[in-house]
Amino acid sequence: MSDFEMEDSASGYDSGDNSDAELQAAFERGDLKPGLNVEFNGQRDKVNDVTKLLAKTEAIKMQLPWLERLDMINTLAPLAPELAVQLEKHEQKRANLFKGNAKLPYIRPEEDPVLNDFKREMLFHRQAQSAVLEAIPRLHELGIKTRRPDDYFAEMAKSDEHMQKVRANLMAKQQGQAKSERIKQIREQRKMGKMLAKQTKVQREAEKKDMLDKLKKFRKGKLKNLDFLEDAKALESKQKQSAENRKKRNKKFGFGGKKKGLKRNTKSSSAGLDGDKSSRRQRGVKAGASVNKRLGKSRRIKAKGRK
């Protein structure tokens, strides 16, 4: 074993002997008791030295004018009548809640946390109100204005570029919501259209089946007339009439496609090759004029004299 290792082992033994000696001394003093292997120190006595505390407070206190501190020590403002009525109603409501419900444990009003929270908020409000009523006149005495002028222009903390980004973001959200609502409406319309088409198809199939059943009954002699066929014929004639009216309207007003420039002349129309319009046009005769040539003036005068 080297000399260094021997020195380390000797120092370890010495530290162990010292710790044992300290424990024995603590046991003799009564600091250690059976079952304890650590020295136990009793609680320190609390010292409330008011003089030193006030002196330390004055030492660290910043001597600034009241205008820089704005600290207030005041009493509570009087409770407004409407707030007193509201508090009373709230207490009555809580009492009725516990009275009419046997499942809830009864809580006295002074121990009710809900009422205590409400009262605490009222105390904060009254304290702030009293501070305002006392501080505003003091500020006026010091010549400090407490109201902004009507033409006051306050510079915004955010730049115009940032507000433009915010506006663009809000507009994008609004457009997205409008687009989403429009898509929902289209889906609902499609769904309703499919439902109506399905109902119409089912109704037609039911009518067809009913008519076939009546025909079978007529063939078997259970029905003596064919009145149901007259209703079908009337419906069919009505549908044909509506189809003819639709064709007439389409021929007169057109149906889809290009409308612009339809009344312009073409090569065939200007040459008089269009059906009805060219029938009245003849060479040397203006459109809309009579085909018979008018008599001359002298012949018209002679004709009048004969009468």
Curated annotation (Swiss-Prot):
Signal peptide: none annotated. It comes from the Eukaryota. GO terms for biological process: ribosomal large subunit biogenesis; rRNA processing. Residues 246-266, 294-307 have a biased composition (Basic residues). InterPro entries: Ebp2 (IPR008610). Required for the processing of the 27S pre-rRNA. This is Probable rRNA-processing protein EBP2 homolog.
